[in-house]
Amino acid sequence: MPPKEESSKVTRRSTRSSASVTVENSEPIESHTPTIDDLTFGEESITIDAVLSNFPGRRSQIFDFIRLMGPLDCPTLPIMIYGGASTGKTSVVLQVLRHLNRPFVYSSCRTCYNPRILFESILNQSLLHRKCSLNGYSSAKRCDKPSDFVNLLREALSSVIKTLESTSETSRSDKPDEKPMGKMVYLILDNVDLIRDWDKGTIILQFLFSLYTVLKMPQLGIILISGLPPDVYYSNMGYTDPIPLYFPEYSEEDLRQIFLRNQPNRKLYSAFLDVVLKPFCRVTRRVEELSTTFSLLFRKFCEPLDDLGISPNEDMKRRLYSHLKPLIAHCLNEIFRVSSHPHDGETRGERRQKASYSSENREELEILDFHMSTSAKFLLLSAFLASRNPATLDASMFDSTGGMDNRKRKRKASEKSMEKKEIAEQEAVMKGPGSFPLERLLAIFQCIASVGDSSFGEEDEEEENTTGYDKENNNLMSDILLQVSSLCDANFLIKSGSCPLEGSIRYRSMVSEDLAQKVAKSLSFPLSKYLYRR
């Protein structure tokens, strides 16, 4: 989000998306002289019921945040809002401040990507300075050093607080019905976890965490928003630790309420969510990713309908699901794509993307185009089999005969068995890839790696050279746990929580069948022989 002084007064910070839009510089905006009202939304405050309805699943976090801020003009300790991406942290903070009509200064460490830009953004807002052509789009103060920033910010905040005190006394007599702004100002620093990647980022973080202690201004409230927990920033510098407030991932029911909001036909969309929400929630719970995918799928879901205002019955739901089913697997594989981290660079991101499934470039990906050790390949296949095969079939799958007996007598499928198979396929799509404990992964790995070792051994005997095989066989299990960690880092595996009874971590494979087949082909491993087909 850009610094606050660059947004218009009318649409001031109404949403994160509107705040990220660059506003054209026009004469009326440039002629506007910023006032103390520019430190608020510049709109009517909203009720607490409106805030709660706008953020399903965030009721407890909203009330906790209001409680931590305290009543009007109450000094507050620094607060750290933390949680994963797309959990509503920034939006909730801004809308609560709009509800309370509290003045604040907002700066994001994503757009303010170095200390100078961050310091000047905060000072510009505190000094009520707006960049425009009249001042050559320059900042009110040039500031590079933390020591200069402290002195300049103290002066700016002192002036703001004096103005708030006089405004508060005037508003009581002139506008008794309007919610007062109070005499405090809040400094909101968003995406503070990105500072860790800055040059001398550790020093800047320690400085920002100690800012409340250094300034010693009870009229200042500091709110830090982070994607990482407070433990990451722990230091023994002696500053006041911020009060943590955690925003967890949205539950499946929360996501349902979010996507049902503002839908003209809630019953039709609810039937659509019954089909797609559960499998996609196993992959991601980020609202923006799901929203993009669901928009495409819902249009496909509604194609057979002439009237979008109808309430579908059970028979119609089945027909709509059958129409949508071929696209679900493709969209799931698209979300399985491994996106590179911001600091990983373009090359790594392109390599991950090439390793992912895509129907458009399937022919180009017939050969595995990235390097992976033999043990990692077998581990990848083991995880794929553990996610796709029922655990109850492990004994028969990996017996001494080597996989399922494909020579069983085939019987003519009855209508009832076909119906059961259809239901099983539907359930499999809705469930998505299954989770498994580490012990099961290692057991499958040991079985299929021994099959691979046998084939390697036969080739070595023909060549009368067993040195390479012996070396490979001895080293195959040496780095298995390290490979599990590496596959998790690359998002080929994800941790799906721990079992409450066993207390052990469970994993889930994010690999598509096409990629698994390519890996198996590079090892000359008969994957289809061990893959359970319903």
UniProtKB/Swiss-Prot annotation:
GO terms for molecular function: ATP binding. Residues 414-424 have a biased composition (Basic and acidic residues). Keywords: ATP-binding, DNA replication, Nucleotide-binding, Nucleus. It is found in: Nucleus. Component of the origin recognition complex (ORC) composed of at least ORC1 (ORC1A or ORC1B), ORC2, ORC3, ORC4, ORC5 and ORC6. ORC is regulated in a cell-cycle and development dependent manner. It is sequentially assembled at the exit from anaphase of mitosis and disassembled as cells enter S phase. Interacts directly with ORC1A, ORC1B, ORC2, ORC3, ORC4 and ORC6. Gene3D superfamilies: P-loop containing nucleotide triphosphate hydrolases (3.40.50.300). Induction: Accumulates 13 hours after cell cycle reactivation by sucrose addition following cell cycle arrest mediated by sucrose deprivation. ATP binds at residues 83-90. Its main location: nucleus. Component of the origin recognition complex (ORC) that binds origins of replication. DNA-binding is ATP-dependent. The specific DNA sequences that define origins of replication have not been identified yet. ORC is required to assemble the pre-replication complex necessary to initiate DNA replication. InterPro entries: AAA_16, ORC5, ORC5_C, ORC5_lid, P-loop_NTPase. Residues 1-36, 397-428 are annotated as: Disordered. Belongs to the ORC5 family. GO terms for biological process: DNA replication. A motif (Nuclear localization signal) lies at residues 129-136. This is Origin of replication complex subunit 5. It comes from Arabidopsis thaliana (Mouse-ear cress). GO terms for cellular component: nucleus; origin recognition complex. Follow a cell-cycle regulation with a peak at the G1/S-phase. Mostly expressed in flower buds and cauline leaves, and, to a lower exent, in roots, leaves and stems. Expressed at low levels ubiquitously. It comes from the Eukaryota.
